[in-house]
């Protein structure tokens, strides 16, 4: 790489991929390749004396993404098994980022009080730093969040989103999903989520089926029309799986994790594919990631919706 032009990101990434010579970057290592890719991206922006997000945009930035705040976590807690992984609040009518953060903080703090009143016990913090779900019933959880929103006076400014992570609730032997104390088929799960979208205001629902349940995603995308169906585990930032999802009309968009796809160039290519094929990408960090993650610059620079 010595002597290469830092402004030529594609050439740098291509060089590393060719030096590695494997399909999944096992020779040089995915972490090493990705770290160098990001470092070169930052260096190129710095040499132009521009913030990275501005360098990525290459022009006027018209808007910033709607922030998503994970306020309630599913999984097992105190004998309660909540199937859906993350209940998300989106202050989609906030006037700016500062107000969106203020709304989210107030709603989160109020939600702790609402949960305490519901259970009679101190709420616990979950693995993703939201409150632990106090009920197996997703509707109870959504109603409690809605009460917190209403109590704070933000009823007209907030919507929901869900990261269901239903791969974790899938029984591969019987081809059923755990939901609210029962095992259900993908048809029943799709019908249930459809009812939720008719009762509550959702921006998106992520990973509502198993990572290989292509038929289920196609059904969901066809049947559920009041919100966006997006994928993370289904697509894993993989170009072949993203293309298959597009061809099957299985999703509206997908989670794009740059260090999962491997290089900045490959991440930009995945985003470009989405933009050119009527889908959208949502950049995302990984658990345990750093505060200054490049995904923030990508989200703003690429004009990601949320």
Predicted features, each with a name:
Residues 23-27, 88-90, 130-132, 253-257, ...:
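Short glycine-rich or small-residue beta-strand-to-loop segments that form or flank ligand, phosphate
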């Amino acid at each position: 790489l010595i002597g290469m032009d830092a402004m030529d990101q594609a050439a740098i990434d291509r060089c590393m991929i060719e030096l590695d010579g494997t399909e999944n970057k096992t020779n040089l290592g995915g972490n090493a390749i990705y770290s160098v890719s990001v470092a070169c991206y930052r260096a190129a922006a710095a040499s132009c004396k521009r913030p990275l997000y501005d360098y990525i945009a290459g022009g006027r930035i018209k808007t910033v993404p709607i922030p998503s705040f994970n306020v309630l976590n599913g999984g097992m807690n105190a004998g309660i098994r909540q199937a859906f992984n993350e209940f998300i609040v989106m202050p989609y009518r906030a006037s700016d980022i500062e107000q969106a953060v203020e709304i989210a903080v107030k709603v989160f703090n109020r939600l702790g009080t609402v949960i305490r009143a519901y259970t009679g016990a101190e709420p616990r913090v979950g693995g993703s730093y939201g409150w632990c779900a106090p009920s197996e019933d997703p509707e109870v959880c959504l109603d409690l969040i809605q009460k917190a929103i209403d109590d704070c006076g933000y009823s007209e400014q907030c919507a929901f989103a869900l990261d269901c992570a239903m791969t974790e609730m899938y029984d591969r032997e019987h081809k059923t999903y755990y939901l609210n104390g029962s095992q259900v088929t993908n048809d029943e799960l799709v019908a249930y989520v459809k009812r939720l979208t008719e009762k509550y205001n959702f921006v998106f629902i992520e990973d509502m089926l198993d990572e290989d349940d292509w038929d289920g995603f196609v059904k969901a995308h066809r049947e559920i029309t009041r919100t966006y169906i997006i994928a993370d585990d289904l697509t894993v930032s993989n170009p072949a799986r993203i293309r298959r999802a597009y061809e099957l009309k299985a999703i509206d968009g997908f989670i794009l994790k740059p260090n999962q796809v491997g290089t900045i160039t490959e991440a930009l290519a995945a985003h470009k594919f989405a933009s050119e094929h009527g889908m959208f990408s949502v950049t995302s960090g990984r658990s345990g990631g750093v505060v200054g993650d490049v995904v923030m610059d990508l989200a703003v620079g690429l004009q990601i919706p949320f």
